[in-house]
């Protein structure tokens, strides 16, 4: 089982990858939205923002997200690490229910290029 530190590191690597991206991925990452990532097996939530092509983690809290972020992710720690490392396809994991993504319809359309 991935640790909180490993999950935070995965989010940092994802942020770095978004910052280096170009084209459609860069455009999708250019949103300015509140973000939460609930790591279900650790019952820990990272909250922050997707802004300027990066993910900024502002806090780590026990339990589910304390507020409803505009973009909400939920998955196990192992799935988060595997997805960021390229060992888990996000679209397949999302379709099978292993990963949950909730956002407004327009945001989902823009985020699809990240999938």
Where are these regions (language model features)?
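Feature captures hydrophobic
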Residues: 1-115
């Amino acid at each position: 089982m991935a640790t909180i530190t490993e999950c935070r590191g995965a989010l940092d690597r994802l942020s770095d990858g978004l910052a280096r991206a170009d084209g459609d991925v860069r455009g999708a990452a250019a949103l300015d939205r509140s973000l939460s990532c609930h790591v279900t097996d650790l019952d820990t939530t990272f909250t922050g923002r997707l802004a300027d092509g990066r993910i900024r983690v502002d806090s780590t809290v026990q339990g589910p997200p304390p507020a409803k972020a505009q973009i909400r992710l939920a998955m196990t720690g192992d799935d988060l690490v595997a997805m960021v490392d390229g060992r888990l396809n996000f679209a397949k994991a999302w379709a099978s229910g292993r990963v949950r993504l909730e956002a407004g319809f327009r945001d989902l359309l823009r985020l699809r290029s990240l999938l």
